[in-house]
Structure formats: C-alpha cells, structure tokens
Amino acid sequence: MALTRPVRLFSLVTRLLLAPRRGLTVRSPDEPLPVVRIPVALQRQLEQRQSRRRNLPRPVLVRPGPLLVSARRPELNQPARLTLGRWERAPLASQGWKSRRARRDHFSIERAQQEAPAVRKLSSKGSFADLGLEPRVLHALQEAAPEVVQPTTVQSSTIPSLLRGRHVVCAAETGSGKTLSYLLPLLQRLLGQPSLDSLPIPAPRGLVLVPSRELAQQVRAVAQPLGRSLGLLVRDLEGGHGMRRIRLQLSRQPSADVLVATPGALWKALKSRLISLEQLSFLVLDEADTLLDESFLELVDYILEKSHIAEGPADLEDPFNPKAQLVLVGATFPEGVGQLLNKVASPDAVTTITSSKLHCIMPHVKQTFLRLKGADKVAELVHILKHRDRAERTGPSGTVLVFCNSSSTVNWLGYILDDHKIQHLRLQGQMPALMRVGIFQSFQKSSRDILLCTDIASRGLDSTGVELVVNYDFPPTLQDYIHRAGRVGRVGSEVPGTVISFVTHPWDVSLVQKIELAARRRRSLPGLASSVKEPLPQAT
C-alpha cells in the first residue's frame, strides 16, 4: 500500500504535464520567457485612465459674436444669429436640472436688442393727431404727459378702432402703453355726449375695472390730469374699507364722469343701489386675464349684466339712450374670452388686436435662471441685494422687486432682511387696506430701493424705475412669469432691466425648460397663444 501511493502521484503529475493547456502556446527553447514588470491591477487602472482621456469632450471653439443663450457649460451656448427650427431639438442648459447634481448651475437669456418692441418700429412721422384724436385731447395729453410724443405700436392699432365704435380685445406685452390706448378715446367720446342727470344716484359715463386698489390708484393718477384739462371728473372706488367708506366716496359731489373701480367695491355699491351703470358709454376691463379668473369672474359677470353693452357701433349713436363700448386689455388672456364676449356683444362688432411679441420672452431684458437648493435662496438673495454690480449699469440706479408666492414668505423674508440691515418695503394681499395705501407709491418715488411683494404688484402697475426683478419663489404659471418679468423694460424706462429667477422644485424646472426652448426658437410661450387667437363663437 505504501508503494502504490507514490506511483499514483507520479502518474497524476505526468498526466498534468503532458495534457494540453488552454491559452498556452508552445515556445521554442531559444525564446525568452515574458517578464511581468507592472502588476496586472495597476495596468488595468492605467488602461482605464487612458480610455477616459480619449472619451473627454473636445474643447469648444467659441465663435465671436453676441449670444442669445449663455450657459455655464460653453457647449450649450446659442449664438444670437442662430434660431432653432420649430421641430428642431437642441440640448437645453436646464435639461438635467431635476437632478440634485445640477445645483448651482445657471444660464441666461441675453438681450437681443436694446429697445422695447413697442417702440422699436415707430415711424418718425407718426403722431397722435394721425390717429383721429381731437385737438382738445392732444392738448390735454401734452399738458398731462409732455414726455409722450409718439404713439406706441399698440396705441397706433387700438385708438382708431375704438374711435370707430368697435369693441376691442387688446392683447399686448406689458409696458407697451395700453392705458393711454383706451383712456384717450374714452375721454374724447365723453366730450361729444351730454351728461344726463336724471338719476338720483351717481351714474358714471365711463368705467374702468381693475383687479387691485394699487392699480386703481395708478389708473386714476394717469386719467385725472387728462380729465382735468378736458373738464371731466375722474375718481376711484376702492374696497377694503367697508361700506361706510364706499358710501362716502360715492356721495361726493359732483359725481364722477369716469370711475376707476375694483370689482368687489363696485359689486357692493351695485347691490346696495348706491350707483347705477345705466348711463355707461365706455366699459374697460384692464388686466382682463386677472378679472376673468375664478376669484373675480362672478363679480365681473354681475357688473356686465348691469351694464348696457352695445351690440355694434350703430347702438352708440343715440346720446339719450347710451350703450357701453366694451374694451378688454391685458398682457395674457385665459381661455374663454370669446365665450364671454359672445354673451354681451355681437362677434362681428369685436376687433382683436395682438402685438407681434405677445406671450414672447422680452428680447430687451436679460433673464437669468439659477438652480438652487431651497436652503441657499436666502444667502443668494442677500448677496444679490448687497453686491449689485454697478459697473454694468448703463443708466441711473434703479429699484428692485422681489416676488414671493405667499404673504407669509414676504413677512418671513422681511425679517431676514431686517437682520441684515437691508431697508425695504413690503406689499402683500393680507395687509390691512390702511397699511397698503401708498406703499407702492412710496416705492415708485424711491423712498426705498427694495420691495418685497406677492403677485399683487405684478399686474399692470407702472414700474419704469425698476432695474431688477428677483423671483425668490419661481412663479407657478407662465402667465405669472410674463407679468413679473414685465415689471422691467417698460416703455419710458431709464434702466435696461434684468430678471433673476431662483429655480428650486422639479415643477419649477418644467416651466424653465419651456421658457428656454421658446427663447431658443424665438417663439411664444406654449399654451398661451391659443387663448387669444381662438375664433369667437357665432351667436345662436
């Protein structure tokens, strides 16, 4: 037994040595054996590094010339001379922003032109006299606003249609001069009509309906100097002070020829029979997209029912049986405008006027988007407010609007700025009416350079002195973004204007991607154009 074990072991070794091995080649006796000088694991690491270097992107050649979109990564820049096709897909700078790894990324939509679209194509020969305005109205305009010399594009299209007695839907970008486009024809029409004092309660002949007290004060401030020169009395009717204040406002004598009112206050006055709309000759819904929202729609419907809207221009000829001419004005319009007009007027009597840049990204305003974590927003805002780069300013120093999505955020952020010794004003809808009075006027007079506010300050308010808009909370809709961004770059602004938006949530990123794609294609923002261009339904 002891001798058999070595024999078996020897036979096993012989089999292993004589058996062919996979992957081995027979070498000649003179061929040297390979020598391993680098460990196999280290050699694999070197090969992986070399493959990574080969796969690195090639350096981007930056071509000279202005940019339309400038991103942190140069390969995502888009030159100003390039426009994407409607169906052409392109890598977006915000493509991966829903990932946490995208934090601190940023891109900007640069200025494509220096002038606002509303004044860029003005003819040197155009004037308000060419639009059909009477000399008395032209003289009043010269006295009230001597800086207004030429009509804007919107005014040149709107004023003649209103003078012909047409109902008008005017949809144009913010800051394009829409207020004067309806005030001047309104006042001229009232000059040619007698005042009927047959009612024991106030009965204005012109009504301008606006969504907020601040906007009512602003429109009244524009209309009063014009009316004073023409012998017409302009007053406002605001809510928030109770019925006693409404009765006091309406009891003032003589009664107003033109009334600028908010829906809530006017609805209360109509319900209490403190005012009549039977002699109305002109009805304007300013910021109509807001007035047709669910929060105001029931009130506006009631006001329209109490107004005698003319079916066409022929109904406006009888001065002793007054009918109202209807005007809807706004920078954006919701769906259903046609259905609303069909309830009160003939579709054939309505003229729709839209500007070429309606619902488009403003080409003369720089817009920057920052992808931030929620906890970093306060530090970034404080840095922006304390270190605004004055070297880039081409004009006088402007003011800053900081938008938040809720009143509580405005208050909380105000305490933070107080801790940093940053002087500011606050404006939000939950403030008592007595506190809100005069806040925006103080901001316009530059008593403070910074205003923290909600969207109450984004609708229609004149802000020609605003240089910077900061969206601390990104707006929930594209309509809100258009209105907020429209606080800068307005007609008559002395500063070019910039918008900075903090992007935090995934739903914010979805809106930013729509904005970026529209800017790269130079097209209007999606989901807005159809609400204005839809045909009016035929009466049944």
Swiss-Prot record:
Q: Where in the cell is it found?
A: Nucleus; Mitochondrion; Mitochondrion matrix, Mitochondrion nucleoid; Mitochondrion matrix
Disulfide topology: none
Which reactions are catalysed by this chain? Answer: ATP + H2O = ADP + phosphate + H(+)
UniProt motif Nuclear export signal: location: 180-191
Which InterPro entries would you find in this protein's record? DEAD/DEAH_box_helicase_dom, DEAD_box_RNA_helicase, Helicase_ATP-bd, Helicase_C-like, P-loop_NTPase, RNA_helicase_DEAD_Q_motif
Keyword Nucleotide-binding present in the record's keywords: the answer is yes
Which GO molecular function entries does the Swiss-Prot or TrEMBL record give?
A: ATP binding; ATP hydrolysis activity; RNA binding; RNA helicase activity; rRNA binding
- In what residue span(s) does the Helicase C-terminal domain sit? 377-536
Q: What is its EC number?
A: 3.6.4.13
Question: Which GO BP terms sit in this record?
Answer: mitochondrial large ribosomal subunit assembly
Q: Where is the Helicase ATP-binding domain?
A: 159-351
- Using the UniProt record, give the first listed, main subcellular location: nucleus
* SMART domains tied to this protein: DEXDc (SM00487), HELICc (SM00490)
Motif range (Nuclear localization signal)? 520-523
Alphabetical GO CC annotations of the entry are: cytosol; mitochondrial nucleoid; mitochondrion; nucleolus; nucleoplasm; ribonucleoprotein granule
Q: Which Pfam families match?
A: DEAD, Helicase_C
What does the entry list as the binding residues for ATP? A172, E173, T174, G175, S176, G177, K178, T179
Tissue expression from the record: Expressed in all tissues tested, including brain, placenta, lung, liver, skeletal muscle, kidney, pancreas, leukocytes, colon, small intestine, ovary and prostate.
Supply the enzyme class, top level.
Answer: hydrolase
The similarity annotation says: Belongs to the DEAD box helicase family.
Q: Which PANTHER family match?
A: ATP-DEPENDENT RNA HELICASE DBPA (PTHR47959:SF1), ATP-DEPENDENT RNA HELICASE RHLE-RELATED (PTHR47959)
Question: Quaternary state and partners of this protein?
Answer: Monomer. Found in a complex with GRSF1, DHX30, FASTKD2 and FASTKD5. Associates with the 16S mitochondrial rRNA (16S mt-rRNA) and with the mitochondrial ribosome large subunit (39S).
Write out the function statement from the record: Plays an essential role in facilitating the proper assembly of the mitochondrial large ribosomal subunit and its helicase activity is essential for this function. May be involved in RNA processing or transport. Has RNA and Mg(2+)-dependent ATPase activity.
Q: What is this protein called?
A: Probable ATP-dependent RNA helicase DDX28
What is the species of this protein?
A: Homo sapiens (Human)
